[in-house]
């Protein structure tokens, strides 16, 4: 239960909500709208896929990427298997994380990359590996990030991640917040709607943002 008296005491609220979840939840609707717009501007709505992917692979660091994989798996159901590629390495050091495609992954599979950081060299290497195998690669990452520069138009498509409406706050806490989750998930839902794995047309995403 939320102690409503905290809403009039910013310092006490900050102590009680150290992960900034309340602010993240409040900003989630705006980030869904922005993320949906970014997906449209990236050309997601104009894609005409030839069929469904055999499998969907999801990669990215932290709890937000894990949440994205879990939600996509739940929404896709039996339409296609959804597998999260777990990183190896030292979690607090993004440069030390590595991701490897399963041996069976190939041209009929879809790799989704979700990162609120975008500085992980291991994700760029994963995208390159997937490109060589013939996988379709779509990523959501910050606009100015090494991952976007390495992948977009070279090894796949990158949709810019929707930033927090009033600028980023504590990166360590915001990366696990609801706003970040929706910023990463929304463009991927738009994509999966186009390939027929989930039902998430633009008007439905707008309804989600309005709730």
Predicted segments with their positions:
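Glycine-rich phosphate/diphosphate-binding loops that line cofactor/substrate pockets in enzymes
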Residues: 41-53
């Amino acid at each position: 239960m939320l102690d409503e008296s905290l809403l009039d005491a910013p310092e006490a609220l900050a102590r009680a909500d150290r992960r900034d979840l309340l602010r993240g939840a409040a900003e989630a609707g705006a980030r869904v709208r922005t993320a949906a717009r970014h997906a449209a501007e990236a050309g997601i709505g104009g894609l005409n896929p030839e069929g469904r992917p055999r499998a969907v692979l999801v990669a990215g660091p932290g709890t937000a990427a894990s949440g994205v994989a879990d939600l996509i798996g739940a929404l896709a159901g039996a339409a296609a298997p959804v597998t999260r590629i777990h990183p190896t390495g030292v979690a607090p050091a993004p440069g030390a994380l590595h991701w490897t495609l399963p041996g069976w992954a190939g041209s009929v599979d879809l790799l989704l990359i979700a990162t609120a950081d975008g500085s992980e060299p291991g994700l760029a290497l994963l995208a390159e590996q997937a490109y060589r195998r013939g996988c379709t690669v779509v990523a959501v990452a910050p606009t100015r990030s090494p991952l976007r520069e390495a992948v977009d138009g070279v090894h796949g498509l990158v949709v810019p991640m929707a930033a927090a409406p009033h600028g980023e706050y504590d990166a360590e806490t915001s990366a696990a917040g609801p706003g970040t989750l929706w910023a990463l998930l929304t463009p991927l839902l738009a994509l999966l709607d186009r390939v027929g794995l989930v039902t998430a047309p633009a008007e439905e995403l707008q309804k989600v943002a309005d709730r």
